[in-house]
């Protein structure tokens, strides 16, 4: 149906969802490497954050933890470099041609990783590599649609048991 309505449209992945997928797989590997540390919610919060968003005392705490787990330190650094690459925006076509081999190298490293979660992530990114690479050129996303959907879900939870669809529809129109 989409191809009929917009035959020349290019699919672009949503940056938020790509970064979230990377973080989820990274945390899954972390749980495998350090099952005890992964239950520490403070460490979980530190490992999920981008390095640029850490306060100095948090950076010290994370550095101490990663120093005691060298394998995690390598994975964390890899994830940070991949995230930095994916967070680039509004690049020229020339810059995108320069960035594409770097992305492909990251994908190859993931696919040849010794961890099943990272291999799966590598295969996923490989199958979506064109759509992921388009994130650098095109900044439009579906954030507004997701926001409306969230508001409608909240409204639906609040109106549980109501049977009048007209009232529900009116509430959606007013909220969104």
For every predicted segment, state its role:
Residues 1-6, 10, 16-20, 38-176:
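Acidic/histidine-rich catalytic cores and adjacent linkers
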Residues 18-37:
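Short alpha-helix plus adjacent loop in nuclease-associated cores
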